[in-house]
Amino acid sequence: MAHVVVLGAGLGGAIMAYELKDQLRPEDTVTVVTKDPTYHFVPSNPWIAVGWRDRADITVDLAPVMQKKGIGFVPVAAEKLLPEENRIALVDGKSVTYDHLVIATGPELAFDEVPGLGPHGGFTQSICHIDHAEAAKSVFEKLVANPGPVVIGAAQGASCFGPAYEFLFIVETALRRAKVRDRVPMTFVTPEPYIGHLGLDGVGDTKGLLESQMREKHIKWMTNTRVKRVEDG
């Protein structure tokens, strides 16, 4: 009998817990430890930012679904890992022991590495978290009411570029539906060596396909960029 703990219950952690429960022996146990009792479907964050979805549409209360699956659930943040003891110390003073540990805590966003970057004290919006996406929605609504230039993209150090392109085309579509696209010049900025690189040296003809779509939709782009700082306006 083995006890497997999954630390984190986001897109990776929740799926991993389900997969483990399906594939491990009946006598093995799985426990999820997470600071957030609610699951957010991160791929839908771009839709939140333009009002195509609401928070309730993409969130799930984890406790009942984990219980139904026979997975232990501890909605308390971890404070410290003690690998020599096979133990996780929690912020409430308690701890969870394990035989095997899966760390799925997600990325640590590095907005502080670029002055002015990020939604917390900076001048850019984000769709990395549902809270960010909701804040971006209010900014998008202001844009519709008072159209002006928009820059969308990714900064150096990003490892996943697909969402930036997705958000670019979602915003373009939402602006057209709002009948203000003609008053919103759009520019895509990326550290990729070419459009459609995606951090993967391209996938098929992503370069040609994406460049074609961006030309058709009158979206300018800048590649091989490094963002030094972001200023208001």
Role assignments for model-derived ranges:
Residues 197-202, 212-217:
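Glycine-rich phosphate/pyrophosphate-binding loop and the adjoining helix
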Residues 200-204, 226-227:
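Catalytic donor nucleotide-activated moiety binding site of glycosyltransferases and closely related
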Residues 132-136, 167, 206, 210, ...:
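Internal, well-ordered alpha-helical segments in soluble enzyme and binding-protein domains
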Residues 1-3, 146-147, 183, 224:
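Phosphate-coordination loops involved in phosphoryl transfer and adenosine-cofactor binding
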Residues 67-82, 215-230:
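A conserved beta-strand/loop element that lines the FAD pocket in flavoprotein oxidoreductases
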Residues 57-64, 210-215, 222:
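Charged, low-complexity cytosolic intrinsically disordered regulatory segments
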Residues 2-72, 156-200:
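Beta1-alpha1 glycine-rich phosphate/pyrophosphate-binding loop at the start
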Residues 71-166, 173-179:
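FAD-binding core/adjacent interface of flavoenzyme oxidoreductases
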